[in-house]
Amino acid sequence: MKKVVLTGSTGLIGKEAKRPLQMAGFEVIDLTRKDCDLLNHNQVENFFKHHKPQYLLHFAWITGNGCLSASLNNDLCDASFFMLKAFCANGGKRAVFSGTCFEYDFSDEPLKENAPIKPRSLYAQKKHELNMICSSFAEKNNISYAWGRIFYVYGHDEKQERLTAYIINRLLQNEIAVVNFGQLKRDYMYTEDISAAFVKLLDSDIVGNVNVCTGEGITLESYAKMIAKKLHKENLLKIHHALTDQPLNIIGDNTILTKRVGFIPKYDYSTALNNILSRLL
């Protein structure tokens, strides 16, 4: 059986990955803080010496308020690279790491994997730096390596500051939900699709950068109204088109994901939101 180490298995995306991994024939080994602190080099080294996986799927990173500028991004970049080296030293063959669309220099056109890079936060800088050093290391050490760039995310048990959770929670409490920048269009992808896409990528021989996205955008206004309509709370939703220096469109080109990796998203917005709401109502 194919043995894979999965990091971030309690996170928004990682927690959805175990089932598709098992369905694809992987034996899944969780690298959790309880068993192995990713920031502790000795523990990481011993973990990979013990398990000797052929595959590595890496989601673990800092999230939530303050994550974009937190100094922990530096530590996680270093720790993730050390983990890849430990993986390689113990017989590892293929690794897939998660990146972010915030590595890109945004434009109104759908972003392709070869689009210019211009990270605007420490988080994005360190993600991009990690990809560069891991890609170079993998090439020199005969490791099959891919970098999946995640765009916008929605799913189950989100942190309260995220847009989807904010809207749902406010409306369920019969309180006003305000969306200030309804004109912005974003490429949102359901966590079950994201995790399944990463598993498909891991189980392929595709190397390099791959956008993990729907390839389509939805305005924040349309997205919020869809949630409100499903909850029959349209009267509690307030939409503004406030001035902002944020890019109008952040949409990915998913041609490599769909044509080369062979992954097609399973869920549309309506079906995915129904799944999310069904666990709350």
Question: What spans do the regions from the language model cover?
Answer:
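N-terminal Rossmann NAD(P)H-binding glycine-rich loop of SDR-like oxidoreductase domains
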Residues: 3-23
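SDR active-site strand-loop-helix element
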Residues: 7, 31, 56-59, 95-101, ...
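C-terminal substrate-binding subdomain of Rossmann-fold SDR/epimerase-dehydratase oxidoreductases
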Residues: 18, 174-175, 179-281
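Adenosine-cofactor binding site in Rossmann-like domains, unifying the SAM/SAH pocket
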Residues: 28-44
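NAD(P)H-binding glycine-rich loop region in Rossmannoid oxidoreductase-like domains
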Residues: 42-77
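Conserved Rossmann-fold NAD(P)-dependent oxidoreductase catalytic core, especially the SDR/UDP-sugar
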Residues: 81-122
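Active-site helix of classical SDR
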Residues: 122-129
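NAD(P)-dependent short-chain dehydrogenase/reductase
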Residues: 132-186, 191-195, 226-228
